Regions:
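A hydrophobic, multi-pass inner-membrane permease signature
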Residues: 2-310
């Protein structure tokens, strides 16, 4: 009898493994499709960037160009100083904004997670409301330009994106579910201040969360061009994304302007317009794509803990 039961258990276990194997195969196919959906557009953009302008005009965008050319990258190298300046602005904004954003977000999340803080519920609601309603572009523009005087300032690219309600909620959930009150009470009995508890207990236990918030902020700052379009008119303060938008608009304006002279028109015809746009996009993608693998482990674990347990 026991042997028959054991055989049944083995059979059911084998059947379960077969189901899991087929399910894994389905998920693998789905993930491969999603990965290709992310990779193929980047490869396609790169292939366009190394296509000759004549090939693009004659045949349109092709995954395998009929004629290859590096004229797009040579054209951008001639504007190397502007690109280097924009790269410096992007790096500075991303680094400074990420550091400040992580510090403020972690502090807010920790304070709101403490049940001993009497105003935790009220300020949690204050943080949560902007996730549903916001003041709009006009009010933000008035505050940043007339009250804070951030027009043509690098801080106009940093402060508006510094703290996100979504990130604060993730931090609050993480601290509330992963740092028991008993540990904090023990530290307080030993004479530790709140800043000591935060720095020596909370932060060391929240490295995955910090990496997750840092990645969110890094991607947000690096890919942002909207703040530049609102607050920046000085080309020396353009980020890479803003520079790409600026170059694209200038190319379109010159290409569609019938009042230009013959020499300028000939130059525009010979300039790799489409290829230059794609080459600029590749230059923007490379730095952030190289950073992601180093934080992938922390990103996945931190996002899972912060979001699912809440």
């Amino acid at each position: 009898m026991a042997k028959k039961k054991k055989d049944l258990d083995l059979a059911s276990s084998s059947h379960l493994n077969q189901i899991q194997g087929s399910t894994n195969a389905i998920f693998n196919v789905i993930f491969v499709i999603l990965a290709l959906a992310c990779i193929i557009p980047v490869v396609f953009i790169f292939m366009i960037s190394i296509s000759s302008e004549h090939s693009i005009k004659m045949n349109g965008y092709q995954f395998i160009p009929s004629a290859y050319s590096l004229d797009s990258y040579k054209f951008l190298l001639r504007e190397g100083q502007m690109i280097v300046t924009a790269l410096g602005v992007s790096v500075a904004v991303t680094v400074i904004g990420t550091v400040i954003g992580v510090a403020l977000t972690m502090l807010m999340g920790y304070v709101l997670s403490r049940s001993t803080y009497k105003l935790s519920g009220f300020f949690t609601m204050v943080v949560f409301i902007p996730m549903i309603f916001n003041g709009g572009i006009i009010s933000s523009y008035v505050v940043n330009t007339q009250f804070l005087n951030l027009k043509n300032s690098i801080w106009a690219l940093i402060l508006p994106l510094c703290v996100s309600s979504f990130n604060v909620v993730i931090c609050k959930t993480f601290f509330k579910t992963n740092i028991p009150e008993s540990i904090i009470e023990s530290a307080q009995i030993d004479g530790a201040t709140q800043f000591q508890i935060f720095g020596k207990i909370a932060l060391p236990l929240s490295k995955p969360l910090m990496a997750t918030i840092a990645l969110f902020l890094t991607f947000g700052y690096w890919n942002d061009w909207f703040q530049s379009s609102l607050y920046i008119s000085d080309t020396k303060l353009y980020s890479l994304q803003a520079l790409l938008d600026h170059v694209q608009r200038n190319i379109e304006m010159m290409a569609n302007n019938p009042s230009l002279g013959v020499t300028t028109a000939q130059y525009m015809n010979s300039m790799p317009k489409e290829g230059a746009r794609m080459a600029m996009a590749i230059i923007i993608i490379i730095p952030i794509a190289c950073c992601y693998p180093f934080f992938q482990k922390y990103f996945i674990s931190g996002l899972t803990v912060g979001a699912v347990k809440g």
